[in-house]
């Protein structure tokens, strides 16, 4: 794998930090915002993000069965029961969750073949392509929701580094 396990965990934790930074920019009045009727609202997107990453990591590690809809329904139902603050707390917990889930995973485990959603891959490739890239994609979606709701001051620094842009001099 191109990334070390430590780099993978660090990258996933960085995604959590950026997501929480962006979530801190949400005005509660925009929680029901959705770009089109069939897209997730801001709160629904956050609720999905509160379980997507860790559940996919568990799937890659064989801790949940790929074809078991009960697993996804249980985590989805738990997420649906959360309010905004509880959802953010669940997301914040991912920092430790990722470290714990991947603690005993070896480089050999990451190179092991795995049946992903699109066919055979390695566990490491699945974790990078689906979990890490998925986190980046969905936080970008949240960023776009924020921009659409008038948060014009947000910049690429918010999106990619999870920080506010320096004040203009």
Map each language-model feature to its residues.
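A short gly/proline-enriched turn/hairpin at secondary-structure junctions
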Residues: 31-36, 57-60
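Short, helix-capping/interhelical loops that line the mouth of catalytic, cofactor-
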Residues: 1-7, 51-120, 149-169
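His/Met- and acidic-residue-enriched segments that coordinate or traffic transition-metal cofactors
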Residues: 21, 25
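Alpha-helical transition-metal enzyme core signature, strongest for iron centers
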Residues: 12-19, 42-57, 84, 88-98, ...
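Individual transmembrane alpha-helices with interfacial aromatic-anchor signatures
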Residues: 118-133
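Short, solvent-exposed secondary-structure junction/capping segments
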Residues: 27-31, 138
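A glycine-rich, coil/turn loop motif that links secondary-structure elements
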Residues: 33-42, 116
């Amino acid at each position: 794998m191109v990334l070390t396990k430590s780099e993978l965990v660090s990258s996933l934790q960085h995604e959590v930090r950026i997501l929480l930074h962006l979530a801190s920019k949400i005005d509660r009045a925009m929680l029901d915002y959705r770009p089109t009727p069939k897209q997730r609202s801001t709160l629904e997107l956050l609720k999905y993000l509160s379980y997507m990453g860790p559940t996919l990591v568990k799937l890659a590690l064989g801790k949940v069965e790929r074809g078991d809809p009960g697993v996804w329904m249980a985590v989805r139902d738990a997420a649906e029961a959360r309010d905004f603050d509880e959802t953010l707390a669940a997301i914040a917990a991912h920092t430790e969750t990722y470290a714990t889930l991947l603690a005993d995973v070896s480089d050999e485990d990451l190179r092991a073949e795995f049946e992903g959603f699109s066919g055979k891959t390695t566990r490491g490739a699945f974790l990078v392509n689906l979990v890490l890239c998925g986190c980046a994609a969905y936080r970008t979606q949240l960023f776009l929701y924020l921009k659409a709701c008038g948060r014009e001051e947000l910049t690429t620094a918010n999106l990619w580094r999870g920080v506010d842009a320096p004040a203009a001099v």
